[in-house]
């Protein structure tokens, strides 16, 4: 029989007690009551925050956001398809609000709304993170918009100028060139030290691929980040995509850089949010949108700002895009976003179909801020342009009914047609501001009145080429002084007369 030694046993027990790890892990765990349509109802999560990330225990480790905090359950929107989440499975609260990695390494990359690369170029090694939803800068942290953001589109830079830190809405029906205006603006930032973020919401993957290849072709991808929430992705990802874009831009803005964010388009984000809200059984309002759809967009667009020098003087310019139905700008989402932004560029389907591209309706397009940032040279030449075009449009409508017109009216019509012609522009070919100044100067001062309408385009191209190759001092003077001084005006007149001679006018 084996002798039992009590002292040995007591030593072993004492050792076990000494080595016992007393650390207790407390987790807030709930149970899935119901799941479907990208929504889960969870019971038992008593201490969850609004907007907190929740971890589901399925094969994909699906993450959700707690949006509805009700008395007996929590409504969770899923950031995945959630096909393997079962009724009765457990859910753990993470104690974190949605955040993403940020850094310079994201430049030139295509990422999803969780900032995970989807371009097969590897995972960027970044240390910094930012909350997807963060507070907009306060009044004291801002300064007035004081620098121009050149789009390279003559009609916009002359009549609807955009400044750094402004929110300018691009609005119009489908297929009127809204994305083209935004892409031209990105392409024109080459060499301007502006970081661009293009957010594609609910678009076809083929459309996003086309945008990326255009940017790559024009050498613009190196300073651009593309955030893509494609049409086949869950509504939750389409809803958070714009906030991800804003967070990526904010990282650069707070480092003192100028940034440009394009949200293409916020109509689809509002529709994704409406879908989520209706599935969560939130009460519907006008057009079945939830009551806080205004706040959805205002909290996003208020993050665009021109920071004061104490905060580094960085800026975030926002160009949200809204798609209208049959030109109806008085629908719910368009009126909301018009009231939040500092102006709008309205693109008209009728103008587009009649060959005027970019199809900007100058009558109802406006910039409420940017003119303060417009360079003086452009103000000097383009001051009368909007009025001239408005008078021309009125006369043109009248002349369709009048049989005989006096000479002055005929001259005004001829000039108006030429002004409209010089504002036409091919896509993906932005024009530098000094050349825009020269083109408008020639049009507004009647130098194109004798040129045949069919030759105006060639005349403008020849003038730009002459200034670029034979008279580079004109461009240098405009860029350095920001004014059209008498010397540069003489150079410009000489260039116009040289080109006119070549056209034997």
UniProtKB/Swiss-Prot annotation:
Compartments reported by the entry: Plastid, Chloroplast thylakoid membrane
**Topological category with respect to the lipid bilayer:** Peripheral membrane protein
What Gene Ontology molecular-function terms does this entry list? ADP binding; ATP binding; proton-transporting ATP synthase activity, rotational mechanism
Q: Which domain of life is it from?
A: Eukaryota
Q: Where are the transmembrane segments?
A: none
Q: Which positions does the site annotation Required for activity cover?
A: 365
Q: What is its EC number?
A: 7.1.2.2
Question: Keywords assigned by UniProt?
Answer: ATP synthesis, ATP-binding, CF(1), Chloroplast, Hydrogen ion transport, Ion transport, Membrane, Nucleotide-binding, Plastid, Thylakoid, Translocase, Transport
Pfam families assigned to the protein according to its UniProt record, in alphabetical order = ATP-synt_ab, ATP-synt_ab_C, ATP-synt_ab_N
| Any one Gene Ontology cellular component term annotated for this protein | chloroplast thylakoid membrane
Provide the binding site for ATP.
172-179
Provide the reaction this enzyme catalyses. ATP + H2O + 4 H(+)(in) = ADP + phosphate + 5 H(+)(out)
Q: What InterPro entries has UniProt attached to this entry?
A: ATP_synth_asu-like_sf, ATP_synth_asu_C, ATP_synth_asu_C_sf, ATP_synth_F1_a_nt-bd_dom, ATP_synth_F1_asu, ATPase_a/bsu_AS, ATPase_F1/V1/A1_a/bsu_N, ATPase_F1/V1/A1_a/bsu_N_sf
The record's function comment reads: Produces ATP from ADP in the presence of a proton gradient across the membrane. The alpha chain is a regulatory subunit.
- Record note on quaternary structure: F-type ATPases have 2 components, CF(1) - the catalytic core - and CF(0) - the membrane proton channel. CF(1) has five subunits: alpha(3), beta(3), gamma(1), delta(1), epsilon(1). CF(0) has four main subunits: a, b, b' and c.
Check the record and name the NCBIfam families matching this protein.
atpA, PRK13343.1
The UniProt family comment states:
Belongs to the ATPase alpha/beta chains family.
**Any idea what this protein is called?**
ATP synthase subunit alpha, chloroplastic
Origin organism is Antithamnion sp. (Red alga)
- Taxonomy of the source species: Eukaryota, Rhodophyta, Florideophyceae, Rhodymeniophycidae, Ceramiales
Gene encoding this polypeptide?
Answer: atpA
């Amino acid at each position: 029989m084996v002798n039992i030694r009590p002292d040995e046993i007591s030593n072993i027990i004492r050792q076990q007690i000494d080595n016992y790890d007393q650390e207790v892990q407390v987790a807030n765990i709930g149970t899935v009551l119901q799941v479907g349509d990208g929504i889960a109802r969870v019971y038992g999560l008593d201490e969850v925050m609004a907007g907190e990330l929740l971890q589901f225990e399925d094969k994909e480790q699906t993450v959700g956001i707690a949006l509805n905090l009700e008395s007996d359950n929590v409504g969770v929107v899923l950031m995945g398809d959630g096909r393997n989440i079962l009724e009765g499975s457990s859910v753990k609260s993470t104690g974190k609000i949605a955040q993403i990695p940020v850094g310079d390494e994201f430049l030139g990359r295509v990422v999803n709304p969780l900032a995970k690369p989807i371009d097969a170029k590897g995972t960027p090694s970044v240390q910094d993170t930012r909350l997807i939803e963060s507070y907009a800068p306060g009044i004291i942290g801002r300064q007035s918009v004081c620098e121009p953001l050149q789009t390279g589109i003559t009609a916009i830079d002359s009549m609807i100028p955009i400044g750094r830190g402004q929110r300018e809405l691009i609005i119009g029906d489908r297929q009127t060139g809204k994305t083209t205006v935004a892409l031209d603006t990105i392409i024109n930032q080459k060499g301007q030290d502006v970081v661009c973020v293009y957010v594609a919401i609910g678009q076809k993957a083929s459309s996003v691929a086309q945008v990326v290849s255009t940017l790559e072709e024009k050498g613009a991808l190196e300073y651009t980040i593309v955030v893509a929430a494609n049409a086949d992705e869950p509504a939750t990802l389409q809803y958070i995509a714009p906030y991800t874009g804003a967070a990526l831009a904010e990282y650069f803005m707070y480092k003192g850089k100028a940034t440009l964010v394009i949200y293409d388009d916020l109509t689809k984000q509002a529709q994704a949010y409406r879908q989520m809200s209706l599935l969560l059984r939130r009460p519907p309002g006008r057009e079945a949108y939830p009551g806080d759809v205004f706040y959805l967009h205002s909290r996003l667009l208020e993050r665009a700002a021109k920071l004061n020098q104490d905060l580094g003087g960085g800026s975030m310019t926002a160009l949200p895009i809204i798609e209208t139905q049959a030109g109806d700008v008085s629908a719910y989402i368009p009126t909301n976003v018009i009231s939040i932004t500092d102006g709008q560029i309205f693109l008209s389907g009728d103008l587009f179909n009649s060959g005027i591209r970019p199809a900007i309706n100058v009558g109802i397009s406006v910039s409420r801020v940017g003119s303060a940032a417009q360079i003086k040279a452009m103000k000097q030449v383009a001051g009368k342009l909007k009025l001239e075009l408005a008078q021309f449009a009125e006369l043109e409508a009248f002349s369709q009914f009048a049989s005989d017109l006096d000479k002055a009216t005929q001259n005004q019509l001829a000039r108006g047609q030429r002004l409209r012609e010089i504002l036409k522009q091919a896509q993906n070919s932005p024009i530098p501001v000094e050349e825009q100044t020269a083109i408008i100067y020639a049009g507004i001062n009647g130098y194109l009145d004798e040129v045949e309408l069919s030759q105006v385009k060639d005349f403008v191209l020849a003038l730009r080429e002459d200034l670029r190759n034979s008279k580079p001092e004109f461009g240098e003077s405009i860029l350095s002084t920001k004014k059209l001084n008498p010397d540069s005006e003489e150079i410009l007149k000489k260039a116009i007369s040289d080109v006119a001679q070549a056209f034997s006018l």
